[in-house]
Structure formats: structure tokens, C-alpha cells
């Protein structure tokens, strides 16, 4: 991921045109590491949209809505991360489970569609079952 981000910079893309999204704040460490590996600086997104010149925006998928970047990396699309296992374990009935799956799938979709020109989606094996939906 760090090399991929570095390649975008080498192509002349400004750092603030890059976004890195994860499922939840628990994976932000992985996003920071990817940005650092590219010798770049990150700014963590919050509920207030704060794109900062010269910095790669990182944040949880739910913060991606309404944003656009020339290049986006969606990382940590691991089987136990998306759908978020904690949400699945807390489901009381089948209808709620379907809602959880739909919400989780929608979060991934929103994060991926923030990319205008370049998209990289990564995960470790076993990867999220939702990645097949992107093909």
C-alpha cells in the first residue's frame, strides 16, 4: 500500500487527493502505517470534513460519504473486519442479520466509490466475502 501511495505521488498527485479508508477506528493504525511507509503525512478525518493540503486523509468508512479523492485505498478488508464481527455477534434475529449485512456492504461500497481515478482494495486472507461484489 505504501508503494501504491508513493506511486500516485510520483505521478504528480497531491497528497490531499489521496484517501485511505478502514472499516472502523480499530484499523486506523494500519492506515497510518501505510501512509508512513510512503513517507507521507496523514490527517485523520472526523465528522467535520477536514481535507488538509499536503496530507493524506485517513478515516473510517462511515466518514467517506460525500467526499471524493483522485485515489483511494480501502484497507483491512479482512473476513473478520468487514462485516464487523462484533455487529454480527450482537444480532438477535435473522432480519437484523440481514440489516447488518446490508449496512456493512453499503459502507464498503461508499468507501470504494470515493475514488475518482484510482482504487486499491486490500485485505489479508481470508478476505471479506463482500470483495466478490466489487468484481
Regions from the PLM with identified roles:
Residues 129-135:
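A conserved SF2-helicase RecA2
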Residues 14-16, 29, 59-124, 132:
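Conserved helicase C-terminal RecA-like lobe
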Residues 56:
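Short, conserved active-site loop motifs that form the nucleotide-linked donor/cofactor pocket
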Residues 49, 125-126:
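Conserved beta-strand edge residues that scaffold enzyme active sites
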Residues 1-42, 47-50, 64, 100:
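Helicase P-loop NTPase motor core
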